[in-house]
């Protein structure tokens, strides 16, 4: 058992010696994660910068407000063989931010074109809108008609409550004319006096009395 522990310890030590720095091997990533498998591209990870710093750098690039470092690094000898391998950090950063600005402009153009295409009124969209408006209007008109029908039914029901139950509706009834002009006819000569005791006259009087008794009182 002790031999296995010693072999395991030596194996871990040998594997850790392959790294550049054993302490930095288990450090968190730029995204503050211990095991981060997202964002890696080509075996390299883009560092996470401060958004305010990036916005300020883009603004300086657009406004051409760049401070060039004219100081010569002491680690490089002007006459030495490594002068050609010196990296221009200002130029590299400028190119990086220019690429970021170009990508932002392309993304903004794509978003603007997408919104414009959605806002453009085509024939099909216009037809759909007209159909929707027409269907809404038809629905409102139908609701109003149903309300009017219900009101008419209720009014008719109220009217039937106040009608005489014994009264019959005569379809051929014509209301009497009351706005006629009075005409004075000449008296009829040689007319016989009315017989008040005639049976026919008494019959009509009885019928009139029956009609008045069956009439509805107001």
Curated annotation (Swiss-Prot):
Where is this protein localized, as stated in its record? Cell membrane
> Where are the coiled-coil regions?
136-164
Q: Respond yes or no to whether keyword Translocase is given for this record.
A: no
> What is one term from the GO cellular component aspect held by the record?
plasma membrane
**What membrane topology is given?**
Lipid-anchor
The positions making up the signal sequence are 1-17
User: Lipid anchor (N-palmitoyl cysteine) at which residues?
Assistant: 18
Keywords for this entry? Cell membrane, Coiled coil, Lipoprotein, Membrane, Palmitate, Signal
Q: Does the keyword Hydrolase apply?
A: no
Q: Where is the lipid attached (S-diacylglycerol cysteine)?
A: 18
Q: What is this protein called?
A: Uncharacterized lipoprotein RT0399
Q: Origin organism of this chain?
A: Rickettsia typhi (strain ATCC VR-144 / Wilmington)
